């Protein structure tokens, strides 16, 4: 069987779909599973052993408009898929599968263009997003964890950076990651609050604080050039390397964005999600019991997260 997953949303959404990928492979172990997504999302699923191929649809770049749509459609037609699973809730994704003549297409009832689906699944707002995605394949079993798969070279690079700053994972040393950015500015906790957290933590020389994010997030004013135990990873590592970094962390603090979802896929860190407009009730909180969510706007203004 040839299966296609279509999901062209944000990075965090792709991370949350990794349990769905695992479940599809468990259900159809001999199948070939391809994943269609944006180029910016590729690295977070690039080493996933359950995927056969990642197909890129640069809908905001070179594939923008009808010409790009037709280019991707041609690829899908040639693949002759048997089954399409579409977490993305927009008609363009459903149209790609329909026009590619995939005989079995499943997606959510709230999707625009859901009338084109062979099977519509209820999008249950009471559930976590991971569980909603697993509803697409009618899974009701034990929890399937989020997973990304850093390679050996990713760990080597991260270890080299950490050791350069004096972090060796020795007893007493703590690695705390702070992810202050988001692709949506309205989800970001005030940067001065993150600065205050870092200022407090860096006083303990056994605490190593890693500031993470994209190259664009370097503009956020969190610079500590004279503090060796504050390490700025922004723009220096990709998402899979970020996974390798997270696997070593004791604590991850971040906004309602992809870092807290990636962190949920690793056993070691305790995850603190700081939520503003994206409320926990929407189902996008950290998918791990080792977590805490702060989502009261008034609380933001009067408190600093306390980290032991």
List where the protein language model places each region.
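Catalytic machinery of carbohydrate-active enzymes
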Residues: 1-308
